């Protein structure tokens, strides 16, 4: 009840996925946002993000965290447009280039 996993379908094929997991009673983490290359540019990532944000709020989370990597420029641009901002590391990612972001829901 406090997490989500979605698969987006387009033209009868799996086009992408997104997940949400609980970190604590008020904080969740966005995981596994991915859209297959053949389906990019159709607004699928944005639609999945809106659904997961709506769900997070409905569950009662007030903060969403995520980690990503610098080469995922399109995703980072979308996250920032949605209001995510940089924060210090919140997990023990083994990659020193990991970017950590937060959104106040």
Residue ranges and their predicted role:
Residues 1-31, 36-37, 49-51, 55, ...:
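Acetyl-CoA-dependent GNAT
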Residues 79, 84:
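Conserved active-site tyrosine of GNAT-family acetyltransferases
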Residues 12, 43, 60:
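Conserved G/P- and acidic residue-centered "switch" motifs that form tight phosphate/ATP-binding loops
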Residues 40:
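Glycine-rich ATP-binding loop(s) of histidine-kinase-like ATPases
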Residues 49, 56-68:
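Conserved GNAT acetyl-CoA-binding A-motif
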Residues 37, 65-75, 92-97:
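Conserved beta-strand-loop-alpha-helix junction that forms the acyl-donor binding cleft
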């Amino acid at each position: 009840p406090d997490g989500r996993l979605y698969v987006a379908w387009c033209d009868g094929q799996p086009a992408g996925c997104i997940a949400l997991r609980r970190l604590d009673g008020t904080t969740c983490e966005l995981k596994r946002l991915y859209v297959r290359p053949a389906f990019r540019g159709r607004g699928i990532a944005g639609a999945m993000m809106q659904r997961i944000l709506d769900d997070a709020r409905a569950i009662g989370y007030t903060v969403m965290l995520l980690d990503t990597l610098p080469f995922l420029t399109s995703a980072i641009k979308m996250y920032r447009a949605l209001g995510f901002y940089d924060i210090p590391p919140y997990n023990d990612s083994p990659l020193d280039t990991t970017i950590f972001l937060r959104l106040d829901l």
